Structures are given as C-alpha cells and as structure tokens.
Amino acid sequence: MLKHFFLLLFSIIVLASCGGNDDPVDPVEPFVPTKTKNAVFVFMPYTGYNSIYGCLLKNLDDMEQAIVKEKGLGNSQILVFISESMKTSHLVKIGYNKGKCRRDTLNTYTNYDYTTPDGIASLLTSVKQWTPADNYSMIIGCHGEGWMPKKQTKQTRYFGGTAIPIDISDFNEGIKNAGMKMNYILFDDCYMSGIEVAYQLREAANYLIASTSEMMGYGMPYHKILKYLLADNPDYEAVCSDFTSFYNNFSMPYGTIAVTDLAYTEEMASFMKAINITHTFDLDKIDDVQDLDVEHFTPTVYFDLGSYLRVLCGDDAPTYTEATNLLKKLVPYKGTTGMIYSWTGRKPLELKEYSGLTISDPSINAKAVETKKQTTWWNATH
C-alpha cells in the first residue's frame, strides 16, 4: 500500500492517450512551444524492482481529471518525464483542447543518465525549450528513502529507486546549473520533508512540499490539489487541507504533508548552531521525541523536529518559545491524519506531536550516526 511496494504493469501506449477515452480523436496539429506564466515539470524516474510505475500513470490520469474539471490549465503548462523501464524514458506534454486532455510524446530517451548534475541540468534545459515560462515548479514522483546516502561515502540522501538512485546534492547542483530556481518542489515520495533535505535545497526552490513519513502508494490526490498547484499564487494551505481530508477518508488513512518556506532554513540553521553550543541532548530522553519512521529504521532515524526541540530545550522556556516561533515561519502549512504507517513495521503509529519536518540529529542508528555528520545541515549547525 505504500510508495515503496507496488508492481502494476501498464502498456506504454497510455502515454499517447488520454486515459482510455475511446471517442474518435480529431486531427491535431504538431505541438508548438508557447510561453506561459507558469510551468510544472513532473519528474517520474525509474523506481526499480519495487516499481510504482502503475501508480505514477494513475497520478497522471488524476492530473488530467483535474485539468478537465477546471476546463484547462489556466496560465500554466505541464511537462512530464517518465521512465517506463531502466533504459527507456519519455518526455510528454500534457495539453487541453475542447474539453479533453492530449498527450504529446516529444522525445524518447534510451539509457539517459538523469542521476548526475549534468544530466539533470540538460533535462531541465529541455524543459525550458519545450515549456517556456516565467516561473517553474517541480513535482517528483518516485521512491524516497529519507536522507540516507545512496552510498555510505556520499554525504546526502537519495530518491528515485534502488536501481537508479539520485543523490539530493547532485539534484540540487543540477537545478542550479540549469539556472531555473523552482517556485516549489513537491516530492510525492516517502521521508522527504526533513530539515536536512530542506537545507540542501534552500537555493534550488522557494518552497518544499513533502511528507515526513511513508506515502501511501496512491500518492498525492492530484484530482483534488492540482488546481492549487497550477495557480499563479499556489494555495499551499489548501493543498495541505485537501490532502488531509482525502486521506482521512481513504482506505489506508495514514498521511503527513508539510510546506516548508526555504527562505527560513538559514535562520533555523543559525538558531540551531547557537543552541547546540548551550544545550546538549540527553540520549536517555530519546524515547520522549516523536518517532516519524515507525520502525522502517530501527533505531529511529527520523524524529519530529518540533518534538526534538522541546526535549533539547528542556526547562529553558524562552529558548523553546523562540524555537517554536521560528518553526512556525519555517513550516507555515502542514497536515496529518494523526496516524502514520510503515510497511516495514507493519503497523500504524499515533502522532502525539507533528511539526512538519524531521531531524536526525539524535539518531543512534548505525547507518546514520556518522553519515549525518557529513550533511550540509550538520556542518552548518555544529
């Protein structure tokens, strides 16, 4: 039921259609790039042996459902990069005309390496060519495994899939090399709403939209929230509200979402550096900090940031008040069903605290205890 474990096989012919509509198709003109105010790049890389390819296709169908309901994309465009296998990927433009969506396959890639800064930058350059716009945003649909490095020698976490992982530092560098800072980056993946990720991406985007914990296989309810994401001024509060409402009524009612204003990550880093000088975390109190990975990692790697600050500050009420006020600016919008789930742990967990971001500073997990010290966040705060 999670973004980690789905195996559904769909024919790639779906990419050339509009979700199974058998009505006669009117002759169409070749796609010609036209500049708009906004463009959203949907990046769906190969997800490996535990493929969620079928789920990603359903996500695209849900996006089209939202577009049809709103009778178009407004001042926005959508361009999709989706990998059907380890070797084959497609660049697809989603358009709207006469009450229907249309998918134009603009390019097919064979063995394209999108895991390097150069590969990412080159792909984003193609995005600019095919969808010229004043503002760009990204939606990323794949697996996410927290900030844990794809190799123990790497300093940051990865996303994508086990076969072709993408390191967040390479992703960040690729965006910067392309010269197209995103309005928002939405990770439709597990474990991506962490302070380590947010700090790494502070120059790549204005906002981070992600989940602190595991994401159900259904993913983001795009048929509900896409209209807010395509708006000239995205309604982040509505995104969180409709996400929470959807999952509260879903068959697997587990979910978290948060919007992080990356402009405040530097201020939070400076605050944490100061507090780490004057305060020491008592490991005997680690069980008092809210766990957000529910035994996916044992011992826990992902703790709630607000909960950690409460325990770290202890009886220092003024410092804790300052911390919570800053956290409210850093995470202006968030939502949760009140319960999270772990495929590995095979059980739900009630949330007693939820700030919208995780932190791994107190983790004693053998895989994290040294690698966390190599992240840009740790170096900025210790």
State the predicted function of each range:
Residues 51-56, 112-120, 162-171:
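Phosphate/oxyanion-binding active-site loops and adjacent basic polyanion-contact surfaces
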Residues 53-81:
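Hydrophobic alpha-helical membrane-insertion signals
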Residues 1-16:
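Sec-dependent bacterial lipoprotein signal peptides
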Residues 78-136, 140-142, 155-162:
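Substrate-binding cleft of extracellular glycoside hydrolase catalytic domains
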Residues 26, 125, 129, 144-146, ...:
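Terminal, contiguous helix-loop blocks that mediate binding/assembly
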Residues 12-37, 361:
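Bacterial Sec-dependent N-terminal signal peptides
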Residues 36-39, 72-78, 131-137, 179-184, ...:
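Loop/turn elements at helix/coil->beta-strand transitions in domains of secreted/extracellular proteins
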Residues 23-24, 33-57, 61, 83-87, ...:
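Cell-envelope and extracellular/periplasmic
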